């Protein structure tokens, strides 16, 4: 497997790294503290082409591959996990399913505005009674002439309230179970569509996480994504791709925490020498960085397989599982290395620890990833 980037892509990634350091990092603490969606950062990323990295130029994208895209998510998440998840949800959960399952007309209508960053995208699957069990959808859609009428609600939706376009899953035939779920492209201004409660969260606090409400929401029939009854398959395939993005988000958080910790233990002195001179510190850092590098290889392998258009569901699950749990371990130990300072907002590691936790939960909990891996091993 070749994970190398072209010279052009290397320059693009370097630009993203510099942008993250100069434009994103200085805002990270304030965005977290105020729970503010960083729209100014999104607009700057749009101008740089970050909002459409893995999509063809003909549809407004940057023409990159998934390895480049996920490396970009890592760089952003290394300094601000909020920014990383905004890009990941937009790219993997909204743009990607339209690219993979949309009609030529749908692609022409929506992708240029989404991949250019003029519009932000989101994805609506989770419901109050349909979390890990995504098949238990209660939102339903009834076809009436040239449109569908949607009723129901979604919760914990990333980018909600700022997104222009939402991929919504709804039951079109309750008697068929998962084969009765369909996918729809829903615009924010469609009649009957509204934003409900905004969640107050432990981490990624600048990321808008809200409820979606559909009360007799009118959706044109041409906005059916794929065929009726194919929505569950679209959702599962979309989540496979999304898990790679979240794995890279977790990787970025972990690497960011390692960077901060290494800097701290070099400077902090106890008993007449720096913390980094103690063998216990050295051994722990060595183990943690080894896990970070192992996670990096897993997530790059998953991204590579996606680019090669070969099955990658198990790879995505393993990457997300390992990267998320590594991020949680690294950030927890980073706080411990910082001692009392690590528990304060004077240093970013406490924010990183809070941000890391969600990577073990959304787009499939760690338990779900283990189920996916085991099921594919035993089939």
Locations of regions flagged by a protein language model:
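A short, Trp-centered hydrophobic/proline-enriched beta-strand micro-motif
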Residues: 117-125
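Flexible, small-/acidic-enriched active-site or ligand-binding loops
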Residues: 136, 191-220
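Flexible, glycine-rich active-site loops centered on histidine and acidic residues
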Residues: 95-101, 123, 135
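A short core secondary-structure module
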Residues: 146-147, 151-195
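Conserved hydrophobic/aromatic beta-strand scaffold that supports enzyme active sites
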Residues: 122, 136-140, 147, 165-169, ...
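Short Gly/Pro-enriched turn/cap motifs at secondary-structure boundaries
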Residues: 114, 129-132, 156-159, 173-175, ...
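Short glycine/proline-enriched turns and hinge-like loops at secondary-structure junctions
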Residues: 64-65, 133-135, 159-163, 177-180, ...
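Alpha-helical interface subdomain recognition
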Residues: 1-89, 101-106, 113-118, 131-134, ...
């Amino acid at each position: 497997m070749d994970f190398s980037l072209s010279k052009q892509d290397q320059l693009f990634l370097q630009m993203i790294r510099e942008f993250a350091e100069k434009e994103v990092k200085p805002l990270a603490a304030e965005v977290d503290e105020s729970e503010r969606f960083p729209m100014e950062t999104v607009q700057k990323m749009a101008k740089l082409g970050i909002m459409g990295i893995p999509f063809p130029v003909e549809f407004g994208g940057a023409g990159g591959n998934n390895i480049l895209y996920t490396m970009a998510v890592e760089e952003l998440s290394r300094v601000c996990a909020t920014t990383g998840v905004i890009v990941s949800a937009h790219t993997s959960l909204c743009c990607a399913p339209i690219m993979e399952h949309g009609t030529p007309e749908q692609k022409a209508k929506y992708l240029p505005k989404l991949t250019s960053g003029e519009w932000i995208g989101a994805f609506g699957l989770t419901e109050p009674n349909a979390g890990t069990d995504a098949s238990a959808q209660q939102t339903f859609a009834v076809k009436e002439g040239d449109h569908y009428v949607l009723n129901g609600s979604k919760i914990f939706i990333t980018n909600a309230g700022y997104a222009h376009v939402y991929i919504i899953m709804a039951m079109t035939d309750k008697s068929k179970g998962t084969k009765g779920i369909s996918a729809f492209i829903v615009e924010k201004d469609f009649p009957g569509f509204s934003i409900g409660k905004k969640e107050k969260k432990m981490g990624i606090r600048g990321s808008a996480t809200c409820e979606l409400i559909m009360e007799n929401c009118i959706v044109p029939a041409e906005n059916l994504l794929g065929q009726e009854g194919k929505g569950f398959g679209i959702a599962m395939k979309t989540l496979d791709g999304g898990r790679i993005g979240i794995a890279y988000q977790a990787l970025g958080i972990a690497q960011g925490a390692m960077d901060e910790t290494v800097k701290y233990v070099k400077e902090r002195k106890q008993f007449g020498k720096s913390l980094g001179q103690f063998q216990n510190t050295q051994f722990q850092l060595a183990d943690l960085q080894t896990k970070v590098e192992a996670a990096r290889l897993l997530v790059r392998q998953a991204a590579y397989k996606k680019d090669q258009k070969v099955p990658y569901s198990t790879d995505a699950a393993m990457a997300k599982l390992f990267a998320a749990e590594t991020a949680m371990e690294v950030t927890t130990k980073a706080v411990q290395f910082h001692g009392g300072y690590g528990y304060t907002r004077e240093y970013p590691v406490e924010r990183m620890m809070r941000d890391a936790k969600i990577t073990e939960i959304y787009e499939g909990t760690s338990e779900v990833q283990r189920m996916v891996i085991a099921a594919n091993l035993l089939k």
